[in-house]
């Protein structure tokens, strides 16, 4: 059905990027200059972008369910009005939608991890360099939770399909410039600081550190960033739903 095609597209897109850039461009580039894993070994370009695309896959799975899906239910399906007429509250609605989006992000992360593990086994270049890479799945869940919470909060303020297009307008540059395909050191320092504030950069650095075995204090900072994102997203969402449907 068309629904499954839409669901699959969010997973397939990062896989295509990995094939085109990782295996294609990676064969020309070789190792990434100045980047080593936790054991001090050089990192191939494919191993460099694979965790970034894993984080992106988790984001894609969460963001589309918590934005377009929620937008339709809010403005056309009139689903939330019926739910809130029962004993359920706005927090229940928010957690239900966000949990569903989180599950999709988790499924994308599981599938993409299987893909990069298979590619690493076939090419002889392991894309997960450390046992800590197993925690990348848990990191993907946190990432999906954060983006789903914030995505639903933003969507609750949008009123038209034209306004919804602003979400993609923000996501694409964030995907391209958040250290997905090359280190931030290529940018001026002030640009680097601006990118540090972006949630996808935080997600990519968290997953990349785990897959490369680089465990440091910065990892905790990335985790806290998403905890704040989750709490803030839930707070804004519940307040907005209350003002829309419980006046």
Task: Kindly label every feature range from the protein language model.
Residues 1-120, 124-134, 138-247:
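Hydrophobic transmembrane alpha-helices and immediately adjacent juxtamembrane helices
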